[in-house]
Amino acid sequence: VRFYLLHSLSHLLITSISLHCGYPSASIHERLYCAPHDGEPAMAAILLATGSAGAEGTLGGLVEEGRRIGRHLRRALEMGSLCANDPVCGGHTPEGDYAERFLEGAACHGCLFVAEPSCERFNRFLDRALVVPTLGQDPRLAFFDAP
């Protein structure tokens, strides 16, 4: 569940940051660090980096966005609470009737999917219902409250 939560939040942050800073979402790549508590401290971290080649300061522009992480997080949570394909998207569970989507919960091209080069897991293992309350799911599943 922790990985699904981190991965879904990462995609929401990629979209939020790309809308604000001008980088296309396809040029922002994720790296997820997630490990359970097995005698060691549990690990849960997201690294977003730009993969676009360009003029000096390409990475600097993305680094600057770290100072606005609160704003990006709020915007990401707002974006995750509703999808253009709700209630169909929001009500989907990994155990649902759609065998081809057994690795996704509430996730689709309208809300969580990003360009495949940006995603280290090829848009699998995603569920925005674990991040924020969505239509068709128990709100207690969500880590964050409704924005």
Predicted regions mapped to residue ranges:
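C-terminal accessory domains/tails appended to large, multi-domain proteins
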Residues: 1-147
